[in-house]
Amino acid sequence: MTATQKHNLFTPEPHYIPGYAGFYPQLRYQVGNTYGRTTAQLLTDPSVQKSPCSVLSPMSKPKFIEDFSKSKPPWMPCRDLTEPYIPHYTNLKPYKNFEILGKLPRQEVDTQGMPQGENISRHVPLPAGFMPYPPYPPCPPGRKGEARDLGHPGLLLAYGEEAWKNAAPLQETPGRYHQLYHCRRDEYLPPHPPQETLDVGRYQRLPQLDHPNLIQRKAISGYAGFVPRFAWVMGMNYRDGVIQAMDDFDKNQFVFKHPVCTLGERLPKTHWPTTTIYRSQGLIPFYMGFIPSMQDNYAMTFGNSTRRAYQKELERRSQTL
């Protein structure tokens, strides 16, 4: 049985698909054929030294190195999940030495058959519906007669664990005793010294410069923005060219705003911008401003419509005068 012959328009096998950007020997020296035909010729040419392994797909099956025949060790949970604190935690543990209400103490029960001196601590079974821990942290227990030693009941909470463990009365810290009392209505804390008001307006002021456009003249090399009059500056570096261009621009703007004229002569008409909307020539197309009475014109071009609006404006002014 003969194999079906492919048409010569199809790329012969084997070949690399277009878009492969890897290295292939002697590909850069082949000219005149497509990428597929060139790679097919190089793959089938015995004179071209190449690796026997294909680059696009592995020739051999992958080998599994991990051995699944051995039994896995039992899973051990993380230590942080089973203990209340992180290992090596040496910081404060609140209510560590306090007796929590509702938690029954351990009872030492001597068991028969065991040597004397060996006791086994067992927990007494709790009744049904009993809550071993209260829903809120209890206050530390105090000792009777200690309130007069410390002077104020609030100092028990202020000193914490050190107050009820130590038998000797604690010395009151000067300067802290009055903070536990609430101020009376006729007693107030000393007022704070007046602070300097923040002047918000100073952040909106521009710095005083020696030159009015000094910020614009400090050009940075590599700035690709627009600099007026810079296109006509040649033969100098960027920084000096920007300074010269800005000087020329400022001089041109000053002359434009203050035209040269003799005393008593009227300023030229080109100095003041025209504010006339209606013209006999009509407005230019793409004018997006509002033109009164133009909405009443139909089947007319923009120029004819604006001329018609100009005529209506003249008629209106003649009637009002």
From Swiss-Prot:
Keywords, comma-separated and alphabetical: Cell projection, Cilium, Cytoplasm, Cytoskeleton, Flagellum
Pfam families from the UniProt entry = CMI2B-like
- Principal location: cytoplasm
Where found, per UniProt? Cytoplasm, Cytoskeleton, Flagellum axoneme
Q: Does the keyword Phosphoprotein apply?
A: no
- Subunit arrangement? Microtubule inner protein component of sperm flagellar doublet microtubules.
Its job:
Microtubule inner protein (MIP) part of the dynein-decorated doublet microtubules (DMTs) in flagellum axoneme. Binds to the intra-tubulin interfaces.
Q: Know the name of this protein? A: Ciliary microtubule inner protein 2A
- Gene source species: Rattus norvegicus
* Organism classification: Eukaryota, Metazoa, Chordata, Craniata, Vertebrata
Gene label: Cimip2a
